[in-house]
Amino acid sequence: ILASGSEGNCLLVSAGGTHLLVDAGISARRICGALQAIGLSPADISGVLLTHEHTDHICGVATLTKQHRLPLYASRGTAEALCRKSSCVSDVLRVIPRAGVFNIGNAQITVFPTSHDAAESIDFRVDHDGASIGILTDTGVVTPEAEQALQGVGLLVLESNHDEEWLLSGPYPYYLKQRILGARGHLSNAAAGAFARRLAEGGTRQFVLAH
């Protein structure tokens, strides 16, 4: 995890020599520095998978993909929203279905819809040679598609965003509390824990809490 939280999100997934970024919500300079720290460069990246168009997920995406000619994969709704934000990267943009399976290099990528207040949010599962990692962040609920796609995943990066009682009694304005708590907001600690238990019963053994 190169960055996680409301100030920026970026995740590196490596699968048999294929390196992918999920989101680019920090500056391109920070991403390049983080890659350099682990012995990689943008030239080693096979593509950027975009979950949705909120700023904390796209802050560095235009600069990174344009400067280094990296393919950018996004759902149609996210792609259109990205262009409306004047971060249009149409020359490197590749539209993918909101649900389905495709391959980039050695990585098999499963796409599934999430429930977030964005144009057409998605998340991913990446499989290679019997190993798998799933990503489920920025969703108000665990969608049926996410539940199905993530069964048996080896490691899950899982949103665990808030304690509901603490959030309600905290300093955030009412409208923001309602947004976070809503079905198209963010996953609560309790909901994340319940989903993690279900996956653990199916064999998932590693969880990384995020956002």
Located regions from the model:
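Structured catalytic core of nucleotide-sugar glycosyltransferases
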Residues: 2-10, 51-61, 66, 83, ...
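Conserved beta-strand hairpin/beta-sheet module of binuclear metal-dependent hydrolase folds
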Residues: 1-38, 122-138, 155
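Conserved catalytic scaffold of divalent metal-dependent phosphoesterases
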Residues: 100, 106-111, 115-116, 129-133, ...
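Metallo-beta-lactamase
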Residues: 76-131
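Cap/insert and terminal regions of metallo-dependent hydrolase folds
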Residues: 144-210
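Active-site neighborhood of phospho(di)ester-bond hydrolases with catalytic His/Asp-centered motifs
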Residues: 22-25, 45-53, 73-76, 134-137, ...
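A short helix->loop->beta-strand "cap" motif at the edges of active sites that frequently abuts
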Residues: 18, 68-71, 201-206
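Active-site metal-binding motif and surrounding structural segment of the metallo-beta-lactamase
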Residues: 27-74
